[in-house]
Amino acid sequence: MSIERITYDNFQNDPFINELDINDETKGAYEILKWAYQTYENDIVYSCSFGAESMVLIDLISQIKPDAQIVFLDTDLHFQETYDLIDRVKDKYPQLRIKMKKPELTLEEQGEKYNPALWKNDPNQCCYIRKIKPLEDVLSGAVAWISGLRRAQSPTRAHTNFINKDERFKSIKVCPLIYWTEEEVWSYIRDKDLPYNELHDQNYPSIGCIPCTSPVFDSNDSRAGRWSNSSKTECGLHVTDKP
């Protein structure tokens, strides 16, 4: 693909949305990733949650740029199973450069400054401190970043394009998996025998921080179980409103 380098300042629309064959094996994901790494080279970062979609993207990225930079927002509140998965990914893809990005405040410092249970009393502020601000720091030196958003995940993600102007981070957000279904994600994982978070086998469709993630037994919503006792549906990385 010969599309020019798209930046936050020159973005007009997604040039790929009606151009790629979404009926191919990866529904356009491989082609988008190939273009992204050829275009942005080292100016693009994959912000990885190590969820199911992440396993698909990591495998595709490793075929295109084996030493790609991947950032995990380590809030210090993740499940041990998530950290175990990261170790397995490092073993399987040893060339990948996986960076564990921590917040400026430790949990103890956050508790002293705000509230010992900030994730419960003000989850938006907690997400800002432990996820959004760290990603702001990471993206300050990048032109674009990759995300595993899928349109079918939730109403707030239903209009996501391959290439998006990201107002939150003043960046370009590349979303290769927008047309994938949850079933296709898991078929890819199983067909390729990829590692994945063991909590998925324990009724956790979506996995984040321990205090804000619950198992789900009666919903087909892939985002169910996140902030289940509140109206909150996003950590804030993919919305423009600030706390």
Curated annotation (Swiss-Prot):
E.C. number = 1.8.4.10
Coiled-coil residue spans: none
Q: Which domain of life is it from?
A: Bacteria
Q: Quick one: where is this thing mainly located? A: cytoplasm
Q: Name one GO molecular function term.
A: phosphoadenylyl-sulfate reductase (thioredoxin) activity
Note how many cofactor molecules are bound and how.
Binds 1 [4Fe-4S] cluster per subunit.
Q: Where is the active site?
A: 235
Metal-binding: is it a keyword of this entry? Answer: yes
Instruction: Give the catalytic activity.
Output: [thioredoxin]-disulfide + sulfite + AMP + 2 H(+) = adenosine 5'-phosphosulfate + [thioredoxin]-dithiol
Which terms are listed as keywords in the entry? Answer: Cytoplasm, Iron, Iron-sulfur, Metal-binding, Oxidoreductase
Q: What does this protein do?
A: Catalyzes the formation of sulfite from adenosine 5'-phosphosulfate (APS) using thioredoxin as an electron donor.
Name this protein carries in UniProt = Adenosine 5'-phosphosulfate reductase
Species: Staphylococcus epidermidis (strain ATCC 35984 / DSM 28319 / BCRC 17069 / CCUG 31568 / BM 3577 / RP62A)
